Swiss-Prot record:
The protein's name in its UniProt record: Pre-rRNA-processing protein pno1
Localization, UniProt: Cytoplasm; Nucleus, Nucleolus
Gene (UniProt): pno1
InterPro entries the UniProt entry points to: KH-I_PNO1_first, KH_dom_type_1_sf, KH_PNO1_2nd
Gene Ontology annotations for the cellular component aspect, listed alphabetically: cytoplasm; nucleolus
Amino acid sequence: MPAPTALKGLDQTTTAGVPVTQAAIVQDDEVLIDAQTSAEESVPVLAPLGENAQDTDMRIDEEGRPVFTPAKDTNTVYRVETRKVPVPPHRFSPLKASWSRIYPPLVEHLKLQVRMNIKSRAVELRTSKFTTDTGALQKGEDFVKAFTLGFDVDDAIALLRLDDLYIRSFEIRDVKASLHGEHLSRAIGRIAGKDGKLKHSIENATRTRIVLADQKIHLLGGYRNILVAQEAVVSLILGSPPGKVYGNLRKVASRMKERF
């Protein structure tokens, strides 16, 4: 009879105890989760999956900031977006007359779908599957809106070709609220000048376009150019002599030529 403390007895007790614990785990597998087995099962899931997994890996630079790989262009889901630009009554007839010059830039350059809705008196824009520029719809809306404000088609097309052009609108009474009746008419006349010469002089000196629509003034051009033109128009509204304003414009024009 071997001693109770023999090594053979210890091996039998240990081997006899192992199946019991495994059986208990198998019976209670819905409640008990072994940490070691779960870690082993999760290893294949977290393993890198070739090149695709390397693209999504996050690396950390020397300063401790995360560095991600550049995103790749993927085929996104096509979604239709629409815009509706209302047309004022006094600009609907010019819109019909110039429609053959308005829709080609929108269709050929921006790849948009355009429709002139006569019933609702609006121009409807919609993206298509050929539209590649994300800002095409906004550019098309700005182009049509510029025409409805009174700008020529050739001037409005510049909004499609250049990205640094803006439109700024304000009313004469925003500058001087006390203008009424004949005083308001004289202020408008000072801005236009005789036969529109002063307005053209401001446009040529500042490289902008100005539209006088009753009591509203619309400016089209670059940011700094609009500020210079607006300052000249405000000076005329406040009563400055046209000669003084024109002299200041000549100085500003010479400075702008030296800058560019």
